[in-house]
From Swiss-Prot:
Residues 528-538 have a biased composition (Basic residues). Zn(2+) binds at residues 227, 230, 249, 255. Residues 264-373 form a coiled coil. It catalyses: S-ubiquitinyl-[E2 ubiquitin-conjugating enzyme]-L-cysteine + [acceptor protein]-L-lysine = [E2 ubiquitin-conjugating enzyme]-L-cysteine + N(6)-ubiquitinyl-[acceptor protein]-L-lysine. GO terms for molecular function: identical protein binding; ubiquitin protein ligase activity; zinc ion binding. Expressed in multiple tissues with the highest levels in heart and skeletal muscle. Keywords: Coiled coil, Cytoplasm, Isopeptide bond, Metal-binding, Nucleus, Phosphoprotein, Transferase, Ubl conjugation, Ubl conjugation pathway, Zinc, Zinc-finger. This is E3 ubiquitin-protein ligase TRIM41. The lineage of its organism: Eukaryota, Metazoa, Chordata, Craniata, Vertebrata. SMART domains: BBOX, PRY, RING, SPRY. The modification Phosphothreonine is found at residue 84. It comes from Homo sapiens. Residues 413-630 form the B30.2/SPRY domain. CDD domains: Bbox2_TRIM7-like, SPRY_PRY_TRIM41. Pfam families: PRY, SPRY, zf-B_box, zf-C3HC4_4.
Length: 630
């Protein structure tokens, strides 16, 4: 199909061949020049006539320079006494000889300029056949004539010297340099301007004009473009200025000394260079498109992740807002009840004090009145009065003092809110765990309810299992997780040496894992001492990349977090005795918290790779115990 598409249109090609390369229109009175190319008679005449004008300007400048030199010579001759004028008869004799030489074929004279000969249009007739033959054979006869002209010139000069003794007589001007006429298409040069009519081409153009009145706009000439200065086809390319030019621009002074090649050759060369860049550019484009598609997918994923995270944040804060509102309402209700009870007690105490004050006021008035009396009236029932006064006792009111553990205290509120928030956030994800005995190291002993583990007094005889840890004292939880959020709490106790966390299902159970280096193997003294020394130096036995475990633990002195990609020393403000472990499978996060204060301890960014993740526990020394909290 490509070959068919590249086949030229015969009609279009025929139209192109009938177009003049100068005027870009159908031939009008076509003529052929010596190289075989055809042009309109008017076009080629005007083109070569324009070249004559440039040559004529140059000749005029040369004549002016020669006239100036002659005037200087005459001035010198006059100063030397050589002022004898040239005789008219001698000059006329010279002119006659020059006319005779012109008739013999000399192309330059003193009376007629060369341009007048050049401007004459030559039409090949029968009598010019012999002269044309000489031209195509190399113009040999013309060279012979030039030799004869030189001999005649020498004879004329000798006669002038004999007849005229004036040494400053001006000599005839030297012959002007022969100019060449150039074909606008192939750039072939000719010594003179000559062309012949092409009648067959004129007839063909008439037929083509009847078929198509105007030249095709899709022709090569139209594709080449038009020179904006000379209105001619741009068929050449200047390699110096790197621009397309026409045949007239080629002869101008701005491009005459430049390297010029046909435009079609440059087009083909540049096409080849462009084709060489096509394949690398195509590969680069494919690579960029792949990267662009990858980045677009990444942007889409990031946007989706951002939306989901924003929704999760909004949901969590919504829960938090509702929780705080509920807690606020409950605390306010309890505070009102407490204050109402306190107000009741205070009111009752005030009533009792008012009644006591009234009794004291009456007794005081009676005592004052009796003290004013005398005689028998004073002594009447005096003992009863004394008894009543002595029986009076001051009863201070009950003073209410706020209890720091009551709900209205700041510390109580903070503690209550923190604890309830922790329960709120962990309640939905909290799981009830048990330990898997098939994974427990033989040196470990599990509690009957499978919620606690410690080091046994001696190595136990247990059946070998593919999942059992044999190189380190570790055990996994019985429940594994492949998605979702999960929370569990672990209580640790004892002197030192424990680790809690999570592990992928593909963990190497036969290799040593966890922070602090290797663990107790068989439990003998040498192994224990060797293990203790390694723990102290924090030298892991196996490469971290083989562990697939994320855990937080201690060797009794330092807390550290260790995974397949990091080993970080921790400095918690308090030594946690109860750890909360929070697993977010989709987010790839495993967080550790102080379950008592909810203080953050450490968070891992993990890659679970679609595997199940199990709770992980490790015991390093006797007296250390780990217990799962319900």
């Amino acid at each position: 199909m490509a070959a068919v598409a590249m086949t030229p249109n015969p009609v279009q090609t025929l139209q192109e061949e009938a177009v003049c390369a100068i005027c870009l229109d159908y031939f009008t009175d076509p003529v052929s020049i010596g190289c075989g190319h055809n042009f309109c008679r008017v076009c080629v005449t005007q083109l070569w006539g324009g070249e004559d004008e440039e040559d004529r300007d140059e000749l005029d400048r040369e004549e002016e320079e020669e006239d100036g030199e002659e005037e200087e010579v005459e001035a010198v001759g006059a100063g030397a006494g050589w002022d004898t004028p040239m005789r008219d008869e001698d000059y006329e004799g010279d002119m006659e000889e020059e006319v005779e030489e012109e008739e013999e074929g000399v192309f330059w004279t003193s009376g007629m300029s060369r341009s007048s000969w050049d401007n004459m249009d030559y039409v090949w007739e029968e009598e010019d056949e012999e002269e044309d033959l000489d031209y195509y054979l190399g113009d040999m006869e013309e060279e012979d004539l030039r030799g004869e002209d030189e001999e005649d010139e020498e004879e004329v000069l000798e006669e002038v010297e004999e007849e005229d003794l004036d040494p400053v007589t001006p000599l005839p001007p030297p012959p002007a340099p022969r100019r060449c006429f150039t074909c606008p298409q192939c750039r072939k040069s000719f010594p003179r301007r000559s062309f012949r009519p092409n009648l067959q081409l004129a007839n063909m153009v008439q037929v083509i004009r009847q078929m198509h009145p105007t030249p095709g706009r899709g022709s090569r000439v139209t594709d080449q473009g038009i020179c904006p200065k000379h209105q001619e086809a741009l068929k050449l390319f200047c390699e110096v200025d790197e621009e397309a030019i026409c045949v007239v621009c080629r002869e101008s002074r701005s491009h005459k000394q430049h390297s010029v090649v046909p435009l079609e050759e440059v087009v083909q060369e540049y096409k080849a260079k462009l084709q060489g860049h096509v394949e690398p550019l195509r590969k680069h484009l494919e690579a960029v498109q792949k990267m662009k598609a990858k980045e677009e997918r990444r942007v889409t994923e990031l946007k989706s992740q951002m939306k989901s995270e924003l929704a999760a944040v909004a949901s969590e804060f919504g829960r938090l807002t509702r929780f705080l509102a509920e807690e606020q309402a409950g605390l306010e209700r309890r505070l009102r009840e407490m204050h109402e009870a306190q107000l009741g007690r205070a009111g009752a105490a005030a009533s009792r004090l008012a009644e006591q004050a009234a009794q004291l006021s009456r007794l005081l008035a009676e005592a004052q009145e009796r003290s004013q009396q005398g005689g028998l009236r004073l002594l009447q029932d005096i003992k009863e009065t004394f008894n009543r006064c002595e029986e009076v006792q001051l009863q201070p009111p009950e003073v209410w003092s706020p209890d720091p553990c009551q709900p209205h205290s700041h510390d109580f509120l903070t503690d209550a809110i923190v604890r309830k928030m922790s329960r709120m956030f962990c309640q939905a994800a909290r799981v009830d765990l048990t330990l898997d005995p098939d994974t427990a190291h033989p040196a470990l002993m599990l509690s009957p309810d499978r919620r606690g583990v410690r080091l046994a007094e001696r190595r136990q005889e247990v059946a070998d299992h593919p999942k059992r840890f044999s190189a380190d004292c570790c055990v996994l939880g019985a429940q594994g997780f492949r998605s979702g959020r999960h929370y569990w709490e672990v209580e640790v106790g004892g002197r030192r040496g424990w680790a809690v966390g999570a592990a992928r299902e593909s963990t190497h159970h036969k290799e040593k894992v966890g922070p602090g280096g290797s663990s107790v193997g068989s439990g003998d003294a040498s192994s224990s001492r060797h293990h203790h020394r390694r723990r102290r130096l924090h030298l892991p036995q196996q490469p971290l990349l083989q562990r697939e475990v994320w855990c937080v633990g201690t060797n009794g002195k330092r807390y550290q977090a260790q995974s397949s990609t990091e080993q970080t020393l921790l400095s918690p403000s308090e030594k946690p005795r109860r750890f909360g472990v929070y697993l977010d499978y989709e987010a790839g996060r495993l967080g550790f918290y102080n379950a008592e204060t909810l203080a953050h301890v450490h968070t891992f960014s993990a890659a679970f790779l679609g595997e199940r993740v199990f709770p992980f526990f490790r015991v390093l020394s006797k007296g250390t115990r780990i217990k799962l909290c319900p």
